[in-house]
């Protein structure tokens, strides 16, 4: 038995808020897990401190599956983003500990490497099409084989995915939600022009992706997918609200553009219909919000039965702890598709020293025992929590809409 004697929650804001769980065993071995829920961080802090940490003390850190089931099945109020994010933090930390005890990187404990590295995609964005293309050219020069393109929409003051003042993209930047204006018609008119220009400049030897961010109806998404077919996107992401699973059937019937969804999914039930009916090509569920490595491995295995690949969320709303965990997961599964990689700020990287590295369009998790990531608690303490909310959208007539 490897008894857990301490578990503490650390909140830090090196440019944005992150929540980290650190578990310590009686032998002095520590493991870290990410518990960040973007814009709702303190809800997970409370859930961990009030409901999970007391039940962790005294348990055997080796019993990862049993502890996972204890917190999931043992709770009548199972599931949901807060509980599953908290559970993911516990799961990551326990896998980190198990790897350190074994003296092996976690991917070796998950069955070993299925590939030499994890192919990632970067984010190129700009206020105009030409700004976006210029950024994409830089990513291609850095070795990226896949790039997500987002650009400002003419007639709209702000657009999802476009950074402010050329800084790292961070939508949750105000004490209270910023209200933005959205126009589907203007958006649908602009996106095909972006990808037409992208293919002219970038050529056909790089994968291109786009994120709609849940803002279309199924028929609108079908029309967009059809319009984008000539440019052979790797995927069209979150084209309709993720809970509208039946809507993907209509989209699928009208376009061959590959579809991706799932970064807000918490468990397999959220994606069951999409996977079984092969209504999507890529599942975007993440280690952070789907209950950790233990649960996501099961979801990926189910997806593999139906020829659906993974494409895990990897924006900066998750810390380098999740990024490391995602890479070990990605290395170990047969149906890996692509991994999102949005670079963290230097301040964040300093707080979370990590072993993973980027080269030739791929991330490599490294071979340090465990997850290969840690938290500098002294440095983290110098960056106190700062409340920040995600924006909200209204239509041009004032109607509240999806962000």
UniProtKB/Swiss-Prot annotation:
Pathway: Carbohydrate metabolism; pentose and glucuronate interconversion. It is an enzyme of class 4 (lyase). GO terms for molecular function: magnesium ion binding; mannonate dehydratase activity. SMART domains: MR_MLE. It catalyses: D-mannonate = 2-dehydro-3-deoxy-D-gluconate + H2O. Its EC number is 4.2.1.8. The record marks 315 as: Important for activity and substrate specificity. Binds 1 Mg(2+) ion per subunit. The active site is at 160 (proton donor/acceptor), 213 (proton donor/acceptor). Coiled coil: none annotated. Keywords: Carbohydrate metabolism, Lyase, Magnesium, Metal-binding. One of its GO terms (biological process) is carbohydrate catabolic process. Belongs to the mandelate racemase/muconate lactonizing enzyme family. GalD subfamily. This is D-mannonate dehydratase CC0532.
